[in-house]
Amino acid sequence: MRIMGLDVGDKTIGVALSDPLGWTAQGLEVIRRDTIEKDMNRLAQIISEYSVERILVGMPKNMNGTVGSQGEKVLAFIEKVKEKIDLPIKTWDERLSTVAAEKMLIQADVSRGKRKKVIDKMAAAVILQGYLDSGAK
């Protein structure tokens, strides 16, 4: 079962995909946010192209586990996705995923300019890999 992981921000959406067996996550692309319609169309294209069967959305939470203002924006985004795309959607705690992605890119000696371009899809991959590693389905 192929799963699409999303790291939803105000300006970008990081997209990652699992392999068909659901073992590993790879960063796919960073969608520059435009209109909600264009965002949904691009997600639908990816879903069709890669035969995605489930969507996992990173849920930003405060360190105490509560949902803050960014989490509310993500919940609103999920509602828009549900209106346009008929797939199961789950959320996953994304706390510190961007920090983990940044550390991986630094360890791989990726330049600061390049990191800025790929950090969101790497964060999506970290979120998705955490979900896959947990065995949750």
From Swiss-Prot:
Gene3D superfamilies for the chain: YqgF/RNase H-like domain (3.30.420.140)
CDD domains, per database record: YqgF
EC number(s) on file: 3.1.-.-
Record GO terms (molecular function): nuclease activity
Coiled coil: none
Leading EC class: hydrolase
Entry keywords, A to Z: Cytoplasm, Hydrolase, Nuclease, Ribosome biogenesis
Transmembrane segments: none
An example Gene Ontology CC term for this record: cytosol
An individual GO BP term: rRNA 5'-end processing
Record Pfam families: RuvX (PF03652)
Superkingdom, natural source: Bacteria
Cell location: Cytoplasm
Family label: Belongs to the YqgF nuclease family.
PANTHER family: POLYNUCLEOTIDYL TRANSFERASE, RIBONUCLEASE H-LIKE SUPERFAMILY PROTEIN (PTHR33317:SF4)
Task of the protein: Could be a nuclease involved in processing of the 5'-end of pre-16S rRNA.
Protein's recorded name: Putative pre-16S rRNA nuclease
